[in-house]
Curated annotation (Swiss-Prot):
This is NADH-quinone oxidoreductase subunit K. GO terms for biological process: ATP synthesis coupled electron transport. The keyword Cell inner membrane applies. It comes from Burkholderia cenocepacia (strain HI2424). It is a multi-pass membrane protein. One of its GO terms (molecular function) is quinone binding. The gene is nuoK. PANTHER family: NADH DEHYDROGENASE SUBUNIT 4L-RELATED, NADH-UBIQUINONE OXIDOREDUCTASE SUBUNIT ND4L. Belongs to the complex I subunit 4L family. The chain crosses the membrane at residues 4-24, 30-50, 61-81.
Length: 101
């Protein structure tokens, strides 16, 4: 039987993997976006675990809102990346530090 602690450890591991992904790979924007999405999924895992543990559905409902915002963020982020790649031929973070009007 899985307890609340198992789900919280899983969420902590997923969150730690996402943090490591951001700090180890600061050059590729796609990896950074994927790491942020993994962070949000770790938080959603904790929301569902606490919601199930407390017998309340508010945490599960909140997960739908977080997933909606995460999907919109991913779509907008990837659209911006495609535009930047077409203009600059790179997606490295170090090359995207200049703003041009």
């Amino acid at each position: 039987m899985l307890t609340l602690a198992h789900y919280l450890v899983l969420g902590a591991i997923l969150f730690a993997i996402a943090i490591v992904g951001i700090f180890l790979n600061r050059r590729n924007v796609i990896i950074i976006l994927m790491s942020i999405e993994l962070m949000l999924l770790a938080v959603n895992t904790n929301f569902v675990a606490f919601s199930h543990y407390l017998g309340d559905v508010h945490g599960q409902i909140f997960v739908f809102f977080v997933l909606t915002v995460a999907a919109a963020e991913a779509a907008i982020g990837l659209a911006i990346l495609v535009t930047l790649f077409r203009k600059l031929d790179t997606i490295n973070v170090e090359d995207l530090d200049q703003l041009k009007g």
